[in-house]
């Protein structure tokens, strides 16, 4: 297997996968996640894990703009390590030069019992390998930084942190009772979100594979970070299998044809099934190639036909059995309506029914859902 621009790192435990034994260090890792930027400008964030079994995740992307292993979070309180200072570990970012074509970014996560092993590997794998005697060229620039914000796109929010906890339900007595679920709290931040505090049009889009039941999908404004916190509670059906989840935030805006950003799709069978399931939902159309969600609200109010006027008639002589109302004489100005239905009253005089006109309609302008954040793509390892 050819791996281009390989990166290595270490992840022992973190907020998304807490230590299995008591430890004063809340997080212990050189990198917290894998970041990928696609050619269309879409971003994906994959929090790292220390799985019990070898795990390889593949993300299909053509002509990537960049990928890297980043250390998001520079507060000493996250690590509390005076010796190794994980809060000062740099991030590594690969910036391809030119077009690399089709391929995948692969993430390898290797089980480790201590922090001395580099158990994380990321690299680019081209879709087509060269024939014997042919040349392949992949030029790129390697960036080292402790300013992860300089890598992020200002047009999209990003994931500040992913926290994992036991799921619970608040009872009427305010006591939280565990319900057998797992909870994931995903904090989205960034200037584009800070500029829209408590925007009611922002919503979450969540997909999961078939191995999990989503029991809560709750999005709240976070006044501390000036971003949004997404809370997901899930129940895993078969813990011996890994579980895939994806989420991002959307905002309703007027439709702009031809300006629909695509979403990077992890090359996972489970995620493809989840995307197909989302596409089948009413009122939602999802482009399978780009996983882009667009909701149109162009339904106009139904027009009501004008009711015919009722003619004056002698009492007791209305044709109630057939439900036919006699029609009054038409105004002189409407007597020449060519499509009016002719009728006769009891005296044989000819009258005309005015032509029915549809009520005016005022359809709402079409809306679309704009992607506001990078895609959070998380794998819950097997046997967790």
From Swiss-Prot:
Main location (coarse class): periplasm
Composition skew (Polar residues), residue ranges: 370-384
Subcellular location: Periplasm
Pathway(s) of this molecule: Glycan metabolism; osmoregulated periplasmic glucan (OPG) biosynthesis
Gene Ontology process terms (BP): beta-glucan biosynthetic process
Cited Pfam families: MdoG
Entry's Gene Ontology molecular function annotations: carbohydrate binding; catalytic activity
Region named Disordered: 276-384
Basic and acidic residues biased stretches: 294-352
CC annotations in GO: outer membrane-bounded periplasmic space
Superkingdom of origin: Bacteria
Keywords linked to the UniProt accession: Periplasm
Similarity section: Belongs to the OpgD/OpgG family.
Annotated function: Involved in the biosynthesis of osmoregulated periplasmic glucans (OPGs).
Name this protein carries in UniProt: Glucans biosynthesis protein G
Gene: opgG
């Amino acid at each position: 297997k050819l791996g281009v621009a390989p990166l290595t790192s270490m992840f022992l435990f973190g907020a998304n996968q807490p230590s299995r034994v008591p430890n004063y260090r809340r997080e212990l890792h050189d990198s917290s996640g894998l970041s990928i930027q696609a050619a269309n400008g879409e971003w994906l964030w994959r929090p790292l894990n220390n799985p019990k079994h070898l795990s390889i995740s593949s993300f299909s992307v053509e002509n990537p703009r960049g990928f890297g292993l980043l250390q998001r979070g520079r507060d000493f309180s996250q690590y509390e390590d005076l010796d190794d200072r994980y809060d000062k570990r740099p991030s590594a970012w690969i910036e391809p030069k030119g077009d690399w074509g089709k391929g995948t970014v692969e993430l390898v996560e290797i089980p480790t019992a201590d922090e001395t092993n580099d158990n994380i590997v990321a690299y680019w794998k081209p879709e087509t390998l060269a024939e014997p005697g042919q040349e392949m060229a992949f030029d790129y620039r390697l960036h080292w930084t402790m300013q992860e914000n300089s890598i992020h796109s200002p047009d999209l929010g990003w994931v500040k942190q992913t926290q994992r906890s036991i799921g619970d339900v608040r009872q009427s007595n305010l006591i939280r009772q565990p319900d057998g679920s797992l909870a994931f709290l995903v904090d989205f931040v960034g200037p584009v979100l800070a500029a829209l505090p408590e925007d009611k049009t922002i919503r979450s889009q969540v997909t999961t594979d078939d191995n999990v039941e989503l029991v809560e999908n709750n999005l709240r404004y976070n006044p501390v970070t000036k971003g949004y916190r997404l809370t997901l509670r899930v129940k895993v059906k078969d813990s011996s299998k890994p579980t895939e989840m994806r989420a991002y935030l959307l905002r309703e805006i007027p439709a702009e044809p031809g300006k629909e950003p695509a979403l990077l799709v992890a090359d996972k069978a489970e995620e493809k099934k989840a995307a197909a399931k989302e596409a089948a939902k009413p009122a939602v159309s999802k482009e399978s190639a780009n996983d882009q969600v667009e909701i149109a609200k162009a339904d106009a109010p139904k027009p009501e036909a004008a009711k015919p006027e009722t003619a004056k008639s002698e009492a007791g002589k209305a044709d109630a059995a057939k439900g036919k109302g006699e029609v009054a004489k038409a105004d002189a100005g409407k007597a020449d309506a060519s499509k009016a239905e002719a009728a006769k009253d009891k005296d044989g005089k000819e009258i005309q029914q005015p032509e029915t006109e549809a009520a005016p309609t005022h359809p709402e302008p079409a809306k679309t859902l704009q992607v506001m954040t990078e895609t959070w793509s998380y794998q819950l390892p097997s046997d967790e």
